[in-house]
Amino acid sequence: MVYPILIFTLPLLLGFLMDRVLGDPMRLGHPIVFFGSLIGFGEKHLNNGASRRLKGFLYNGSLVCFTFFLPLLTFAFLLIGAAINYYLGDLYFGHFLLLAIALPSTICIFYMLSGKTLVTEVKGVFSALSVSLEAGRKQVGRIVGRDTGSLSAQEIRTAALETLAENLSDGVVGPMLSWSFFGTPGILTYKMINTQDSMVGYLNERYRAYGFFSAKLDDLVNLIPSRTTAILMLIAAGRLDLLRKTFQHGKRHLSPNSGYPEAALALVLSCRFGGPHDYFGEVVDKPYIGEVGRELSDEDLQRAVQITQRTEWLALGLSLLLRLLLILLIIWYL
């Protein structure tokens, strides 16, 4: 009883710890790069002519289904094999088959989480700004999807902290919650959807039709993670008294999800996010989130990183608890 429970919970803990220590192993190759290649191939060959929305739905929807069902069927085969061997009394081979599920799951979780890399990149923005404004613009351009060539120092710091809050949900909390309920197929599919949205889920002329499905699906799968992230951030900061304001300000964002973690961080730091954003020639006026329009400093970065790292640990604990409850429920039902 204990061994199967450990096999189906420990991968999350180990994968999380590996991410905290090692960060993204880009030199070894990364599944997200492969996801991006598949998405880019479809966009290049299908995002033209008529019926773009339909073509985007069929191609990107197929990628989502493939990403979920291929590992699901593989792990189901291994799990059935383990169950048969346990039934026949061959415990050693049964244990081996469960390990064949757990080890790839651990590696997959490690690759899908981006907590350390996110913090490193945001710190790099503030460090680059201390060198020059141009260096700060170049560095922040690595983590935001808009034109950074005309940003002021304050706008660069704001963009970095906005990204820190938003990607805490997309890159850490969301993947862990997905794994706690749906295992490795869930976390892979979540990141496929998230990558599609980051590549083709824009409202400009080029992507509005083709990326419609990807954008809406990303909105759907992030409804719970984004709000959970905001709540965990407030707990991490010891500011649950800001919960109502966080949800009020979070609703102002043009995205149905991004505003909640951003609002939590802005209110805790007593600063303000939002305002005009230049998306490569197209200016988008985002509603202001937060109450105090002031200059951001290195102290704000330190506080934001502290909240982020505490939130990651809280999300880990929550995800492990949910996973354990799900396993116990399945065992009880069977």
Model-predicted regions and their roles:
Residues 198:
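RNA/tRNA-interacting regions in translation and RNA-turnover enzymes
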Residues 1-188, 193, 201-334:
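Hydrophobic alpha-helical transmembrane segments
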